């Protein structure tokens, strides 16, 4: 089962998050039929979104959107404080040969000219929006830059996805380390040294390391785990929600659907679920107006 952990380390000077998202990203790949490079880009983004969501409280939620100008188009992911995450890419059928490091060429798929935005719904009247320029297109580095620039928290983000030859997901996961105010230079140096030597997060997950063990590896010491949260692909779409959207089109538009097609089909971007509305259902919706 996928899950994430929230922890502290170095006598409370470092806040840390780590997640195994393998099953969750496998479900996203299955629903969207993403090709390997698109799977890696979507998986990295969803993993980051679920860890950012873990920083929220209660019913708070967020939406991440990456638009880098590459062939994959936009990558969108929703996360919340409960470990729910969902996501999609504009063009799921993108794949390139491995890059010079022998890894999936996510940068080429995402592009390097555009923005990463995070919109938080904290239950207040206004939404909180943070936006930064994309700095690498590799996604982990872009989220690091977002946290440092937009939220002013010195951070390190690692996200990774390994894809099997048959397109299924072999391993997926990530970590976020954040320095709290007053962190001393010795701790910073130790973390930097450790991060430069540790294996990629996807390799650690593939080897069977738990999120707790991943944090111990990247931190260089055992973390104090504060909370464990299950992670899962969850979509809150429903036929009722789409019905409300159809009603919002107005009587004339609904009548046109009835006259031209005798039915209507609505598809959720996030989970690819399709909802069919029969002629009788459309007439009932029309008559509600």
Swiss-Prot record:
Biological processes per GO annotation: protein refolding
Superkingdom of origin: Bacteria
GO MF term list: protein folding chaperone; unfolded protein binding
Record InterPro entries: Heat_shock_Hsp33, Heat_shock_Hsp33_C, Heat_shock_Hsp33_N
Database matches in Pfam families: HSP33
UniProt key word Disulfide bond: yes
Signal peptide (UniProt feature, chain positions): none
Cystine crosslinks: 235-237, 268-271
Localisation per UniProt entry: Cytoplasm
Record's keyword terms, sorted: Chaperone, Cytoplasm, Disulfide bond, Redox-active center, Zinc
Protein modification: Under oxidizing conditions two disulfide bonds are formed involving the reactive cysteines. Under reducing conditions zinc is bound to the reactive cysteines and the protein is inactive.
GO cellular component: a single term: cytoplasm
Family: Belongs to the HSP33 family.
Function: Redox regulated molecular chaperone. Protects both thermally unfolding and oxidatively damaged proteins from irreversible aggregation. Plays an important role in the bacterial defense system toward oxidative stress.
UniProt name for this protein: 33 kDa chaperonin
Species in which this protein is naturally found: Bacillus licheniformis (strain ATCC 14580 / DSM 13 / JCM 2505 / CCUG 7422 / NBRC 12200 / NCIMB 9375 / NCTC 10341 / NRRL NRS-1264 / Gibson 46)
Lineage: Bacteria, Bacillati, Bacillota, Bacilli, Bacillales
């Amino acid at each position: 089962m996928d899950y994430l952990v929230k922890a502290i380390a170095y006598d409370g000077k470092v806040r840390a998050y780590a997640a195994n998202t393998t099953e969750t990203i496998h479900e996203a790949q299955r629903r969207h039929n993403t090709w390997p490079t698109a799977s890696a880009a979507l998986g990295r983004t969803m993993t980051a979104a679920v860890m950012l969501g873990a920083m929220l409280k209660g019913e708070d939620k967020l939406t991440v959107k990456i638009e880098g100008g590459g062939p994959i188009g936009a990558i969108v992911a929703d996360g919340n404080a409960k470990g729910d995450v969902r996501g999609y890419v504009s063009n799921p059928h993108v794949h390139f040969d491995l890059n010079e490091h022998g890894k999936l060429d996510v940068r080429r798929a995402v592009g390097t000219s555009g923005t990463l935005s995070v919109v938080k719904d904290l239950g207040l009247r206004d939404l909180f929006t943070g936006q930064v320029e994309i700095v690498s297109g590799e996604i982990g580095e872009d989220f690091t830059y977002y946290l440092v620039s937009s939220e002013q928290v010195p951070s390190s983000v690692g996200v990774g996805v390994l894809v099997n030859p048959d397109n299924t997901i072999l391993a997926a996961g990530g970590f976020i380390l954040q320095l709290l105010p007053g962190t001393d230079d010795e701790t910073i140096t130790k973390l930097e040294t450790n991060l430069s030597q540790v294996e990629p997060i996807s390799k650690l997950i593939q080897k069977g390391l738990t999120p707790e063990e991943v944090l111990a590896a990247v931190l260089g010491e055992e973390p104090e785990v504060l909370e464990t949260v299950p992670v899962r692909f969850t979509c809150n779409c429903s036929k009722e929600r789409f019905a409300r959207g159809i009603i919002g089109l107005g009587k004339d538009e609904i009548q046109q659907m009835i006259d031209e097609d005798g039915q209507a089909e609505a598809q959720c971007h996030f989970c690819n679920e399709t909802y069919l509305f029969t002629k009788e259902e459309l007439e009932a919706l029309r008559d509600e107006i």
